[in-house]
From Swiss-Prot:
It catalyses: (R)-pantothenate + ATP = (R)-4'-phosphopantothenate + ADP + H(+). The active site is at D112. The keyword Metal-binding applies. This is Type III pantothenate kinase. It comes from Desulfovibrio desulfuricans (strain ATCC 27774 / DSM 6949 / MB). The keyword Glycoprotein does not apply. Its cofactor is NH4(+); K(+). The lineage of its organism: Bacteria, Pseudomonadati, Thermodesulfobacteriota, Desulfovibrionia, Desulfovibrionales.
Amino acid sequence: MQPELLLFDIGNTSIKIGLAHERQVVTSYTLRTDAGQTADDLGLKLATLLGHAGVTPQSLRACVASSVVPGFDPLLREAVARYVDCPLYRVGADLSVPLENRYERPAEVGADRLVGAYAARRLYPEFPGLLVVDFGTAVTIDCVNGNAYMGGLIFPGPRTALSALSREAAKLPRVNLDVRADEPTPGRSTATSIQHGLVFGFACMVEGLAQRLKRQLPGPARVLGTGGFAASIARVSPVFDHVLPALLLEGLRRLYYEERTAF
C-alpha cells in the first residue's frame, strides 16, 4: 500500500517524521527542531524526504502533527501548505485524544504524552494498567488505567543531564552514552565513570519508579519504552516489556483513522 499520511512528532530537540497508511507506519526520519529556519527550509527538507521514500505530495491525504513547541507550529503550517498541499491536523487543536484526562488542568498535558498513552492503550487493550516511558529532552513516565490517562512523572533526560554536567563542571567532558557492559563497574577513567553513572543510573531510576507506579495500577501492568534512549536502557535492564521506537507515530496514525469521520 502507498503511504497516504505524513506524520510529525515535534519535540524540543528533534522532529520524528513518519509515512503511514491504514495498516502501519511504513518508514520514519528524524530532523533537528530548528524554529529559526524558514518555511522554505523545512519544506525543501520535506520534499527531499518524500522523494527518498518514493512518495509524491499528491498521493498524501493528510498531515498529522503532535507538537510541544508552539513556536514551531506556524512554520509547519506554512511549509505543509507550500510543499505538501494537504490538510494539516494538529493534536489538541484539530484532533482530540479519546482518553479520559485526569490531569488537574487537562490543557497542561503535552500532546506527545497523550498520544503515547493513547497508542499504548490501543496496542495493548488486554492490559488495564500501562506505563509509557518516553526518553527525550525530558523523560516522561505516563500512567494509563483502563481508558483514563492518570498523569505521570517528568525528569531530565540522559542527554540533558549530560549537557548540564559538562556545562556546570569544568573538568567533566561530554562523552557518548554507548555502554556495552551488562553491569556497572567502577570507572577507571572519567569518561567510563560518566557513561556508567548515567546509563545505569537512569536504568535503576526507571526500574524503581516503574515498580512503585505499577503498585498503583491494576495488574499485571505493562511497561513500554519509547524515545531515542529506550533501546540503550533495554540493553542493561529488563524494565521494559516492549520497546516501541515509533510509538508516537503509531498513535498519530491510529488517531487520524479513528477520528477521521469527524473531518
